[in-house]
């Protein structure tokens, strides 16, 4: 007798459920997406014990006809595609026909549905077996309840996380669906307590305000671009509003939330040097394209996609963000603490996106050089950098008006840190409607960020504090400038242009530099030897797993040759390519940091004025190459409020 046998449908569904239904969040995602595909305009999600005990989804969509109810729970049964041509033109969120049978096979499921023009259908399924089917009175739409999830797969149940974590995973999914479909009203409840309510009026900014808070919504920059193949719309935060995780960036493709590392990287590249190292923006990007250009049939969870014109899309995203930021003055405001507590606390802060971190491809970042230790080497000697100042013989004394106790100046728009879960509110429909109307009104009152150019306004110096911070003023208020960061930006743009113009000339090393590698690393570097020659780095094999370098490009900064060579090797080993543009930029950053004035260095008024004027000539006078802010602003109104001149 043969050993190979065909598995029965129930066992096949259990196996399929392992990929489709990983946790309660997977069930919520699949069922809510089905509701959206059914043209629902209102969806309610009710949870008990983070969905492990009960998940109930109620919608007002098209419903399911009686004759389709049983078929819907068979494997690969779907109304969304008919043939292989449809598979490459998918516009719906679901299409595989795996979700419902997979969910039903590992839970106790109850379905009440009606198309509105016939009696409804009541269906009960337990562990994949149909227990009951009957006609029932029902409004148009679908009401589906999933209870005792994983009751028949105890091994899966054992690996569920805490209630807090599983609820965080669900809210993460619901938030992203809400952003993807602002035209759908979503209500999320946990143990009969409301967590989220969106109006469904199509305003993405209002959804973002519901999730992240009205304060974050006020710091959103609208993004819009179009090419022959792609249309991009969305919002990203100003560089002053960041998080410690990239999971606060959401990418939507044809209405589907996807996890795509290269899209997130493109958003980061759009900020370029505006972000501090290790900080990420809050962003929402909706991308529309011909379904033929994207493959969504990569994984049963449908979170991963592949693009056929990926490089064109990435370039469009980067250029769109860079263009938007060039139109804005990126000076963060230094706020004043007031007695009034902000009403709108971010729902997102309750259940942080960290609970649902996406698994990213193992493509490590090449870390940009951090700010160098101020006690390291002396500044490099260059012919035409920004002026390098020496402390004046007569130490400049700050005006008496500035000699006072050091105050704690904190920008009001500093990165919003993650906060613990706050108490959930019991659901009250009247209170809910009032809160939603109040939020709508606040979003309508948000002033659009002025797109009137990013030129730094004229600044008039009035003093210096601790030999580190410059005070300046104009008709808009008081400015505080970090003198090291300011000159670092000036020098960076000088060195960046200088390094970028250098021809492919090489310089001999006095002592050859030896590079020892593992066998895998050696093979990868050997594969890229010709590419390395094109950028002026010549390697000679030395032994079985080593190379020696006898010469290097002339643009390598003096004293940093071996460090740049190591960076190039790291690129080749990890990225399997040589990015000369990135290497030159890193060299410019290192050179600019070393050549800049340091803290605790007093300047004359003339030197301060010259520094500010030179800063105004840079293309980005707002952040240093490492993304730290160069200056912060106190408006005249804020100062008057501090001193109780206005109330």
UniProtKB/Swiss-Prot annotation:
Pfam families according to UniProt: DNA_mis_repair, HATPase_c_3, MutL_C
GO cellular component, one term: mismatch repair complex
CDD domains for the chain: HATPase_MutL-MLH-PMS-like (cd16926), MutL_Trans (cd00782)
GO biological process, one term: mismatch repair
Spans through the membrane: none
Superkingdom to which the source organism belongs: Bacteria
Gene3D superfamilies the UniProt entry points to: 3.30.230.10, Histidine kinase-like ATPase, C-terminal domain, MutL, C-terminal domain, dimerisation subdomain, MutL, C-terminal domain, regulatory subdomain
Function noted in UniProt: This protein is involved in the repair of mismatches in DNA. It is required for dam-dependent methyl-directed DNA mismatch repair. May act as a 'molecular matchmaker', a protein that promotes the formation of a stable complex between two or more DNA-binding proteins in an ATP-dependent manner without itself being part of a final effector complex.
Protein name: DNA mismatch repair protein MutL
Gene field: mutL
